[in-house]
């Protein structure tokens, strides 16, 4: 999962995905709030980005944009409605830009903003800010986390900024109480946010004061962290009561789902056809798993064999971390030495444990990219899913089994090389259009990471370890199951329990991980379907590129990844008009 420039705050863990902060005294590579030219589209883009950063200051911090580090977002109902009005006005302005007055690159920028604003418009009457507490809980936690992720400012300045943000936590949680409607809120999503709020109490009390190694600023930061922890504790009590009254639904329905696929992502099919594509892919990949299991184990009980492989898990979270570091290094060498992709300048990916507040809601590895607007290439961060504090021995064993030794190679490819880390580092180095460093589609970004898993298998990366190769197919099959479940949940064709059963019987997930996964699908409609859908679309574009003799495999990878993380339909248009 690319949680990253990266807009997961909109998911249930709410990992920010779009913005960031920069050391004010360092040389600024690019101020995205200033037009890159006097052309009308560049002025519109700069105004649009300034409004985006103003609406999501922690997102600005992630991206490396200076001037937003002391603030949290305004999430009151009037503020949300005011942004809706601004979005509609900007949508009309971008739609009014005619093709014949724009260059090819400008048309891509225009259409990228239009796709984003249309997606928001399609979900406006869903009133997510009245349904899901996650964004309110995540605002303060991610607000602090993003400040210290890349440490782009001196510790004393970061401590002061974090103190300001923590002081705003009670205000944000008060906005949640005013906005949340028990008739609209789903109990499942409330429970998910409650788990994060409780983790936030511990994060603020125990982790935040240790973020600053020097005494200067630590006292004020510690006091603000305790006050924020108290606010999260009170909000946890509120959510525990609110859950009992919540009676809303999480399913967005076929009309919204299809509109997002077609009008936002530029796909040619809607929710029903996507579900059937998922079923077909699931059947094909399950057959492959049976065949590979027969070759390795002499029987075709692939789920039983995968369970055996899961028993060969790292004995401790620290061993899991070491394994991910080893495979990340191997994947990097393979991708560069084989000439599959070009190396970005200053490339570095740090493999580190997940933060405590994230562990309660994410059981899988995830990634944050280097801030694209900061001075000089910084490291990306590949976060390893350590179990949360207080996890029972059984829960720790299950978390480790989900990260069995046979899975580490595929996950390292997906999250690091040449998956999320390489893509986002390459895009940051190659993309000169500011808006493409900010807006992206999960169908491309996650599609890319799954595409390269298969591409690396085709190139022989897993050949020396048939068990790891089987797990690559297993993890791809899991993404096919996601398509079936995500569409079925939001079309009202599956209950949550049905979905958990499906994922823990048709895919290889354990019941605990399956339940966590399904809760994520409920909170983030269409995202779970993006992985395999995007991967198949990118593979189709690759085959067309190579078939037309347009260049080498590396040329294709460098070209399409360098365009950004465009919606699939727009990526295809841009690829056809490139070079």
PLM region descriptions:
Residues 1-25:
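N-terminal amphipathic/basic-hydrophobic helices that include classical n-h-c signal peptides
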Residues 19-579:
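N-terminal maturation segment of proteins
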């Amino acid at each position: 999962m690319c949680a990253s420039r990266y807009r997961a705050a909109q998911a249930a863990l709410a990992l920010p995905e779009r913005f960031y902060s920069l050391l004010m005294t360092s040389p600024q590579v690019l101020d995205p709030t200033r037009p890159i030219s006097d052309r009308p589209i560049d002025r519109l883009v700069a105004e649009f980005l300034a409004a985006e950063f103003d609406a999501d200051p922690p997102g600005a911090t992630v991206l490396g944009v200076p001037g937003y580090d002391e603030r949290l977002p305004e999430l009151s109902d009037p503020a949300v409605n005011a942004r809706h009005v601004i979005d509609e006005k900007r949508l009309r302005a971008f739609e009014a830009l005619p093709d014949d007055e724009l260059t090819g690159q400008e048309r891509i920028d225009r259409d990228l903003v239009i796709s984003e604003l249309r997606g928001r418009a399609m979900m406006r009457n869903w009133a997510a800010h009245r349904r899901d507490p996650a964004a309110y809980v995540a605002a303060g936690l991610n607000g602090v986390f993003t400040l210290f992720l890349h440490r782009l400012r001196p510790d004393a300045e970061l401590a002061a900024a974090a103190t300001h943000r923590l002081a705003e936590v009670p205000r944000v949680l008060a906005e949640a109480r005013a906005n949340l409607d028990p008739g609209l809120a789903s109990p499942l999503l409330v429970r998910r946010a409650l788990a994060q709020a409780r983790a936030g109490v511990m994060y603020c009390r125990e982790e935040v004061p240790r973020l600053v190694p020097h005494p200067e600023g630590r006292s004020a930061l510690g006091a603000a962290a305790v006050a924020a922890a108290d606010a999260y504790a009170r909000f946890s009590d509120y959510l525990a009561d609110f859950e009992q009254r919540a009676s809303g639904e999480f399913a967005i329905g076929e009309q919204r789902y299809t509109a997002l696929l077609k009008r936002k992502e530029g796909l040619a099919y809607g929710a029903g056809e996507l579900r059937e594509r998922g079923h077909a892919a699931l059947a094909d990949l399950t057959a492959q798993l049976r065949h590979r299991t027969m070759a390795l184990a002499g029987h075709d009980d692939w789920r039983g064999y995968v369970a055996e492989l899961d028993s060969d898990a790292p004995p401790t979270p620290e061993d899991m971390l070491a394994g991910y570091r080893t495979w990340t290094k191997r994947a990097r060498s393979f991708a560069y030495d084989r000439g599959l992709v070009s190396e970005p300048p200053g490339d570095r990916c740090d493999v580190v444990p997940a933060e405590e507040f994230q562990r309660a809601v994410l059981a899988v590895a995830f990634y944050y990219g280097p801030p694209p607007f900061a001075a000089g290439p910084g490291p990306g961060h590949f976060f390893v899913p350590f179990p949360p504090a207080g996890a029972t021995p059984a829960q720790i064993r299950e978390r480790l089994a989900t990260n069995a030794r046979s899975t580490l190679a595929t996950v390292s490819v997906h999250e690091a090389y040449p998956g999320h880390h390489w893509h986002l580092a390459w895009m940051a180095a190659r993309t000169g259009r500011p808006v493409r460093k900010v807006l992206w589609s999960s169908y491309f970004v996650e599609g890319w990471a799954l595409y390269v898993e298969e591409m690396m298998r085709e190139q022989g990366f897993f050949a020396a370890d048939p068990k790891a190769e089987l797990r690559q197919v297993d993890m791809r099959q899991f993404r096919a199951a996601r398509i079936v479940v995500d569409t079925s949940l939001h079309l009202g064709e599956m209950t949550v329990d049905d979905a958990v059963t499906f994922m823990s019987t048709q895919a290889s997930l354990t019941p605990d991980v399956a339940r966590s996964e399904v809760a994520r699908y409920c909170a983030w409609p269409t995202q779970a379907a993006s992985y395999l859908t995007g991967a198949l679309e990118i593979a189709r574009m690759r085959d067309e590129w190579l078939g037309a003799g347009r260049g080498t495999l590396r040329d294709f990878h460098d070209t399409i990844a360098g365009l950004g993380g465009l919606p699939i339909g727009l990526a295809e248009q841009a690829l056809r008009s490139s070079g």
